[in-house]
Amino acid sequence: MTHRDFIAVGASAGGVDALRDLASRFPPDLPATVAIVLHVGPHESLLPSLLSAAGPLEARHAEDGQIYARGKIYVAPPDRHLIVDGTRLRLVHGAKENFARPAIDPLFRSTALEMGPRAIGVVLTGLLDDGAAGLEAIQACGGATLVQDPADAFARDMPLNASPFADYILPVAGLAARLVQLVGGTPPAPGKTESACHATAHRRITTEQHAWIGDRSPVEALRELGVPSMFTCPDCNGSLWQVNGSRLLRYRCHTGHAYTTGSLASGREDDVERSMMDAMRALQEREMACRARGEFFGKQGDTAAQTREEEIARRANEAAGLLQSLLLER
């Protein structure tokens, strides 16, 4: 008989406090494994020691290939994706998803595939929308899904974007109580329609996951998963493919980077700002160079050349000022 016994949790901005609160409410005999991704990038993380101190369960950074156990908390280490592979945990230095490594979606996606109805996915506070696609995968494969109430979250974006795929939306205290109720319980048996949906979702998620970890050709996988889009990857400048079969607009490139529309738009916003800053710097340097040339021609008595350079400098100054105003208004 299937029992819910694997909890995958994702958090970002404000996540340390939310995770400590959640860990403090777990019972010491929790009959489930807890796997956590917090967006820490490549930076050193003290999260396992903080969670161990906050509650009764031991927390540690996950190790590649280790067998996971119930009643333990495993945290993704810096700069490594954490995924589930059968009875073991794997650490992968794969392509970033939603500009993050570790990212939440790879953990949730692998949890959906490996655990099916045994899985419980939890999205906590954070910016943008990492975790939404992964929570959709867990729900599609028969798992239970929980989201922190946006009103209770330090950052509302991730909970809001994941809410369409949530079975329960609760503050952290309510999430902990609901998790205790769900763990060890038997998921309801799916009907025929649900079973067919689960099978279709499982095939799509399997294709996506195997391409991401390099078990099959990403080019062939992308042809199965979706269609070419008009966008290019912000990380590698490769072509992005729109992933079909999801209620979210999602994109992947053949090197493994993946984005939801929120993350993609945010990345493009950064690109626009960098481009505008580069253009403003170039215009300011052009102004300085032309003023220097104007002074040189003035000393040579060439007033026509001096006037020409000063006019070019004036136009460059105006253009740089316009860009600066646009940047300040953003």
Label each residue range with its predicted role.
Residues 1-295, 314-328:
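Conserved acid/base catalytic micro-environments in cytosolic active-site loops
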Residues 300-314:
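Short, charged, amphipathic alpha-helical segments
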